[in-house]
Amino acid sequence: SHPVGSGRYMLKQWDRGQQVILEANPGYYGEQPKMKRVTILFMDEDAAFAAVKAGQVDLAYTAASYADQETAGYSLLACETVDNRGFNLPAVPVMEKDGLKVGNDFTSDVLVRRAINLAIDRDEMIQNVLNGYGSPAFSVCDKMPWYNSDAEITCDRDEAARLLDEAGWIVGADGIREKDGVKAELEFLYPADDSVRQALAADTANQLKEIGINASTRGAGWDTAYDEAQSQPLLWGWGAHTPMELYNIYHSMEDTGLAAYSPYANKTVDQYMDEALASDNLEESWELWKKAQWDGSTGITQEGDIPWI
């Protein structure tokens, strides 16, 4: 609660989950900051915009879905970030582990996962949900030095439909695909307090209906969402200037043999990431992270396992 540092500001007060108050450091070696006191409030994007409307804050980080709304006394600043949104697709068939449902019989087929990825029109989603303020995301590390551009694809619903046909999911009389009497259905979860992810989930569901998948959405609290994501898609938010994002999402855990947030395992992918962490050469480690994404024969991209979109 009393960190020692040499930066422009010192921690004056920290109310966990509510706010942080910073004061200018009189001993700072450089030019003194013009703002002598900064209060940072912890609030979600919707609450931040409400604070703007009420004139309670000077600056707010909020959702792009509010970008088309004007507020007197405020101007819009669009910043490029590595922040991204996406969803998991459980990559193993249904099973039970320690009393928890794990896996999904529909998304465990790699052809289905590839079809879903091809069916998503990211540009359309940016316009519909984010008012044009965004860029297509193909991984959790777009634009980073360790990003493998082989992850990039173009929306192709004809090819998506062909892949589903190949996987045995045939369009029925009601327009919904079936296989062995089972409907092609998916429920997309989103954090109940996140309006942007709710809208992204709804847009995703609507797009997948175009290829015969009966998709729906449901809000969930984080007290249950982590467990539910072991067997169905959940809209996640990622973005960090570290390749550990890849490790945390895709590397299998020793106790379960599967990745932490959604069931998936690939020993070759694990090995590349382990070698990257053990490397004492930064540039060489980046190449290993890239190979974990796609090495020409396996990985986590469209031509590989594609367990996240």
Regions found by a protein language model. Name each.
Residues P3, R8-V129, P145-I176, D180-G304:
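Extracytoplasmic/periplasmic ligand-capture domains
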